[in-house]
A protein has these predicted regions:
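Single conserved hydrophobic/aromatic residue that forms the stacking wall/gate
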Residues: 1-20
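Juxtamembrane regions of bacterial inner-membrane/periplasmic proteins
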Residues: 17-211
Length: 211
């Protein structure tokens, strides 16, 4: 479908905290049809003079291949089940390296942090945006079970130009639903998350194969 309307989950600049509270409650049971990050990509496409066709097929976590879920956790957030949304060791290293460089560079984002960014924020690397991400991350962890956070993440993560979520990615790159992804396919899909608009799981680069 072609997406042009403003996403219901995009936070206005005024009084964003109350909007987050209400949307967090909806996220317990409702599957968002769009996110702020999706809207950002749509806006980029419109400015470039091309429509953005979004491909996304929402599937429950239990209908995603276990090897795919595990591959994403290993690649993106090995401590997911144990932390409270933030990996403090990685966060400390990130702050130290960013301070040395004089700018925000290193990601060190957990799955919950990435979900917070995708739902509500932009991709900009500014201290203000990063601070908002940390606050939103803690709120998501407080309001949602871990399995729901993982389900939301796997259905909303960007996996290529106009490709969102595990099922759309599995079908686009390998012609199978997320439930039928093999272990090698899962590894390639997980490895591409780091930069999904560059790395193509169906035509993996040497770097992606190493990941």
């Amino acid at each position: 479908f072609f997406f042009k309307q403003k996403t219901a989950y995009e936070i206005p600049k005024r009084d964003w905290s109350s909007d987050v509270c209400s949307s967090d409650l909806r996220l317990k049971t409702d599957n968002p049809g769009s996110t702020a990050f999706m809207q950002m990509r749509v806006d980029e496409a419109l400015r470039a003079g091309r429509p953005m066709r979004l491909r996304q097929h929402w599937v429950p976590l239990d209908r995603m291949a276990p090897v795919l879920r595990q591959a994403v956790l290993v690649s993106e957030d090995a401590k997911f089940w144990d932390h409270d949304g933030l990996d403090y060791d990685e966060l400390r290293i990130s702050i130290q390296q960013d301070w040395a460089r004089g700018r925000l560079f290193r990601g060190a984002s957990t799955i919950t942090q990435q979900l917070a960014k995708n739902l509500y924020l932009s991709a900009s690397k500014t201290p203000t945006r990063k601070f908002a991400e940390l606050l939103l991350t803690r709120r998501l962890e407080a309001e949602l079970p871990k399995r729901r956070i993982l389900e939301l993440y796997l259905n909303l993560i960007e996996w290529g130009d106009g490709i969102w979520g595990a099922d759309a990615a599995a079908r686009a790159y390998f012609g199978v639903p997320a439930s039928d992804v093999s272990a090698p396919q899962a590894a390639l899909l997980a490895g591409a998350i780091i930069n999904p608009r560059i790395y193509n799981p169906s035509r993996p680069s040497p770097y992606l194969l190493r990941r």
